[in-house]
From Swiss-Prot:
A single GO cellular-component term on record: plasma membrane
Summary of the function given for this chain in its UniProt record: Transports adenine, hypoxanthine, xanthine and uracil. Transport is probably proton-dependent.
Protein name in the entry: Nucleobase transporter PlAzg1
Membrane spanning stretches: 27-47, 63-83, 103-123, 143-163, 178-198, 201-221, 249-269, 289-309, 325-345, 347-367, 391-411, 421-441
UniProt topology in membrane: Multi-pass membrane protein
Length: 441
């Protein structure tokens, strides 16, 4: 078959034979990945609209940045990975930065853009190793686990399973309240689907919960199910970069950078191992993969969404046999179709009780990183513990990271192990000490 679509040429480009896969397998794998990650198209705009952003604008931005980043890593890296806005870091953006600190979402986008620009420089140079090596492994895992606790806490609040209390700060909500009861049922349904390993359990769980919400009178059906993509003008190029250059926002920017680099690097290595793409313990073509993520972070800020990351949900497509960039390309084709279903997505997201179960489960899934913390080493374990526990309790990911850095350095000094601390970590700890102790309000 010659012409624009030459099958043999594409088979050679994607190395189908070398990686022991076929067109059929790659297509099925792409569909599988789509089913497991499509919930993000609902949850990400739902979270960011809580911060005052336009839902439709974020929805279109989410799809576009996913397409841009994923096509780069698929075509130039030939990896079966999908890149999209990350769960957890979007909650940090909306609830910790914008709502808790009162920072305009436009300034938060400016912070994301600055973090993405630095990420891009790191991806193009060898300095990315400098940043990765500076942060202790235990703290890296603690940051991911703490973010999971944070997003789980947000989910419990949205479900009103946890509510504020003047006596105990928080308390158990009224389980007989219709919305709370709906979230409990939705969580149970989703867990049932996951128990039976149903692909797309999170998304299907939201669909079932939405139907129940409509039956209970908690949700109105959209007047139409399809629409021309719109709203991007409300979020694209709205970022405020000038407002980023103060101590508090630089701490936020540093946090965006850390989480983006750590999550991206860790997830890609894990997925590459699952797909059998590691060569002698090395991750081949890592630069192109990192560039795709860095470009995604910066373009996401320009379009109007929180930082992106390589999705762990890509593992479902790999488990289905996906081994090349064809897998995410199939996912991208399906994503283009979903762009026209914004009214349906907005309806699903309009009731926080519907998306709450997904947040709780996503948060839980991030806790598996806790097992990698060196719990038998006090100076490694205690700072990690503080990072995890202070994230949800302070509603601030950046403050929790700063506390972890400071305590880690102090404990190493107390133990006479100053040489074990990377020189850059001393600078990071001092930066957060000044920010938290003298500037943060």
């Amino acid at each position: 078959m010659k012409g624009t679509f030459d099958v043999s040429r594409w088979e050679t480009w994607f190395q189908l034979k070398e990686r022991g896969t076929t067109w059929t397998t790659e297509i099925l794998a792409g569909c599988t990945t789509f089913m497991t990650m499509v919930f993000i198209l609902v949850v990400n705009p739902a979270i960011l609209s809580d911060a005052g952003m336009d839902f439709n604008g974020v929805y279109v931005a989410t799809v576009l940045v996913t397409l841009i980043s994923t096509l780069i890593i698929a075509l130039f890296g030939n990896f079966p990975f999908v890149i999209a806005p990350g769960m957890g870091i979007n909650a940090f953006f909306a609830y910790s930065v914008v709502k808790a600190q009162g920072i305009p979402w436009q300034t938060a986008l400016g912070s994301v853009f600055l973090a993405g620009t630095v990420f891009l420089v790191l991806a193009l140079t060898r300095y990315r190793r400098f940043l990765l090596d500076a942060i202790p492994q235990s703290l890296k895992y603690a940051i991911t686990a703490g973010t999971g606790l944070f997003i789980c806490f947000v989910g419990l609040q949205n479900a009103k399973l946890v509510i504020s209390s003047p006596d105990t700060l928080v308390t158990l909500g009224n389980l007989r309240e219709p919305g709370t009861l709906l979230s409990i049922i939705g969580l149970a349904v989703t867990l049932l689907l996951m128990t039976y390993r149903i692909r797309g359990a999170l998304f299907l769980g939201m669909i079932v919960t939405s139907v129940l919400a409509w039956i209970m009178g908690l949700m109105q059906l959209p007047s139409h199910f399809l629409s021309i993509p719109s709203g991007l003008a409300h979020t694209a190029l709205q970022l405020d970069i000038d407002g980023v250059f103060n101590y508090d926002m630089l701490a936020v920017t540093f946090t965006f950078l850390l989480i983006s680099v750590f999550e991206t690097t860790g997830t890609m290595v894990s997925l590459a191992e699952q797909a059998g793409l590691m060569k002698e313990g090395r991750f081949p073509h890592s630069r192109s993969a990192l560039l795709a993520n860095a470009v995604g972070v910066t373009s996401g800020a320009l379009l109007g969404t929180s930082p992106i990351t390589t999705l762990v949900e890509s593992g479902s497509g790999i488990a289905a046999g996906g081994r090349t960039g064809l897998t995410p390309i199939v996912t991208c084709i399906l994503l283009v179709i979903t762009m026209f279903f914004a009214p349906v997505a907005e309806t699903l997201a309009s009731t926080p009780f519907v998306t709450a179960p997904a947040l709780v489960i996503v948060g839980f899934s991030m806790l598996e990183e806790m097992v990698h913390v060196e719990w038998k080493s006090f100076e490694e374990a205690f700072p990690s513990f503080l990072v995890m526990v202070t994230m949800p309790l302070t509603y601030s990911v950046s403050s929790a990271i700063g506390i972890g850095f400071i305590v880690y350095v102090l404990l190493k000094l107390f133990r006479g192990k100053a040489k074990e601390v990377h020189p850059a970590l001393y600078f990071f700890a001092l930066f957060f000490f000044i920010q938290l102790g003298f500037i943060h309000s």
